[in-house]
């Protein structure tokens, strides 16, 4: 039981970048897909229901898929967008993942445009 408590304390103490690395390890090595917010992912029964839910979405996550050839320019943009230090921004760009969470559509599109102009491959989720 003490081992589980120590494990829980270690997980709670992770930085954002360490949590991102843990997610990647669990996904790549063990095939465990994280569910957003602990929610159970269920496929929609009808195609129209999914389209309606997509239209109503007001908050978006900006996800970096690939830094591209101009990684230095992407790191500079990520630093400007997130306010992270150089090392943290570099680690985030190399690991990929969410740059910003829960932003309005206009802001998400603006961030996406900046990162794509720097050479990155970005998607809104």
UniProtKB/Swiss-Prot annotation:
Top-rank taxon, per record: Bacteria
Keywords associated with the record: Ribonucleoprotein, Ribosomal protein
Family matches, as InterPro entries: Ribosomal_bL12 (IPR000206), Ribosomal_bL12_C (IPR013823), Ribosomal_bL12_C/ClpS-like (IPR014719), Ribosomal_bL12_oligo (IPR008932), Ribosomal_bL12_oligo_N_sf (IPR036235)
Pfam families membership: Ribosomal_L12, Ribosomal_L12_N
GO cellular component: cytosolic large ribosomal subunit
Keyword Lipid biosynthesis among record annotations: no
Keyword Ribonucleoprotein recorded: yes
Molecular-function GO terms, alphabetical: mRNA binding; structural constituent of ribosome
Biological process according to GO: translation
Database matches in HAMAP family: Ribosomal_bL12
Function, as annotated: Forms part of the ribosomal stalk which helps the ribosome interact with GTP-bound translation factors. Is thus essential for accurate translation.
Subunit structure, as described in the record: Homodimer. Part of the ribosomal stalk of the 50S ribosomal subunit. Forms a multimeric L10(L12)X complex, where L10 forms an elongated spine to which 2 to 4 L12 dimers bind in a sequential fashion. Binds GTP-bound translation factors.
Family, as annotated: Belongs to the bacterial ribosomal protein bL12 family.
Name of the molecule in the record: Large ribosomal subunit protein bL12
Lineage, top ranks: Bacteria, Pseudomonadati, Pseudomonadota, Alphaproteobacteria, Rhodobacterales
Name of the coding gene: rplL
